[in-house]
A protein has these predicted regions:
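Positively charged N-terminal leader segments that act as targeting/secretion signals
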Residues: 178-192
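Non-heme di-metal
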Residues: 1-178
Length: 193
């Protein structure tokens, strides 16, 4: 199929359905904010259907591998975005006088680098059998019910909600950083407690 019009059409269909899905999701959010729940639900339902159409074409032209393979592919895509795509777009935007858009391209480029690093770390965890185990005790949290378990390994099954080990992650504790945030940020945080 490589190099055929059908391959090009499959990629175009995937891109079109993917863009429609995102667009309809944005429209659903706007309709909901404006008080049109039924219209929001229809936009969201259509977005979900467009996702399934996109998946159909993507499976034909690319396929969906195992998690490790998908992490490699995702990291490569993020690498391209932060090392090539966004820097080129930022340069061109700046040359055309769109300084603010160039700055946005550069800012998103930095986020894509974080995405690549995250995918690489997750791949390392998968390859080393460290997704659900660690060398030292840590706090594992069930992503379904919030149950906490202390140990070197996540439990095979959550004793509270009976969800499998797959639902456990190391408990994130990034909210401790709030104390080190700039004064204005701390003030905003205190408004929402």
């Amino acid at each position: 199929m490589k190099g055929t019009k059908t391959e090009a059409n499959l990629w175009a269909a995937f891109a079109g359905e993917s863009q429609a899905r995102n667009k309809y999701t944005f429209y659903a959010s706007k309709a909901k904010k404006e008080g049109y729940e039924q219209i929001a639900a229809i936009f969201q339902e259509t977005a979900d259907q467009e996702k399934e159409h996109a998946k159909l074409w993507f499976k034909q032209v690319h396929g969906i591998g195992g998690t490790a393979e998908n992490l490699v592919d995702a990291a490569a895509g993020e690498n391209y975005e932060w090392t090539d795509m966004y820097p080129t777009m930022a340069k061109e935007a700046r040359e055309e006088g769109f300084v603010e858009i160039a700055a946005l391209f550069e800012a998103v480029s930095r986020v894509e680098k974080v995405h690549e690093d995250r995918y690489k770390k997750l791949l390392e965890n998968v390859q080393n059998g460290m997704v659900f185990s660690r060398n030292e005790e840590c706090v594992w949290q069930c992503r379904n019910c919030g149950h906490l378990h202390v140990g070197k390994m996540a439990p095979e099954m959550c004793p509270v909600c009976a969800h499998p080990k797959a639902y456990f992650q190391i408990k994130p504790e990034n909210y401790g950083l709030i104390e080190k945030a700039p004064r204005g940020a701390l003030f905003l945080f205190s408004l929402y407690r």
